[in-house]
Design a protein with these regions (language model features):
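Active-site rim elements
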Residues: 3-11, 85-92
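Acidic/histidine-rich alpha-helical segments that form the ligand environment
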Residues: 78-116, 127-136
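Short, contiguous alpha-helical
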Residues: 7-15, 19-22, 30-76, 119-158
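A generic structural signal for well-ordered alpha-helical segments enriched in polar/charged residues
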Residues: 19, 23, 27, 97-100, ...
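Alpha-helix C-capping/helix-to-loop hinge sites
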Residues: 28-31, 81
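A general marker of short, structured functional hotspots
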Residues: 2, 43, 77, 90-91, ...
Length: 158
């Protein structure tokens, strides 16, 4: 791993975490997709994780943030059980969109940007990124637990 600057380390860790995310998503059996944990179906847990990553990694207060085409009001809220349903293709498409968005963002990021606040935002870029890594990996762990409880197998990780 190259450790030449903070943004290089953040970029590499993000690339690895995106790989882990793809791996976990690929390991979720179709039979588990609609099973509810804590009241929410597995796909909604995934959507929640992805939506928060999409909105919070860069700037949660961005007035130009656009909800994904599959979004319905409160779909990301795990306390509100949806009438809508997302299939694997819709989740995968959203994941690929986020992956591309983060790649562009990280390409433009420099160390001196990390302690700056994005426009209209309370927190620094560094705080937002670390907070998302915490939240993101909490949900990856939950998803891995769902898979392991169902299959007895643990998804492979880096």
């Amino acid at each position: 791993m190259r450790e030449t600057s903070y943004h290089v380390v953040i970029t590499e860790m993000t690339v690895r975490a995106l790989w882990e995310t793809q791996n976990v998503l690929d390991c979720i059996p179709d039979a588990l997709w609609d099973i509810r944990f804590g009241g929410a179906p597995v796909w909604q847990h995934i959507y929640h994780m992805l939506h928060e990553l999409d909105q919070w990694f860069i700037n949660p207060d961005d007035p130009d943030f656009v909800e994904p085409p599959v979004h319905h009001p409160h779909l990301q809220n795990l306390s509100i059980y949806p009438a809508a349903h997302l299939d694997r293709r819709q989740i995968d498409d959203y994941f690929y969109t986020i992956k591309a968005k983060l790649s562009l963002y990280l390409t433009s990021l420099h160390d001196e940007d990390l302690l700056q606040r994005p426009e209209n935002c309370t927190w620094t870029r560094f705080t937002l990124i670390l907070a998302q890594f915490r939240h993101w990996h909490l949900h990856l762990g939950m998803l891995m637990g769902f898979v392991q409880a169902d299959t007895g197998l643990c998804p492979r990780t880096l």
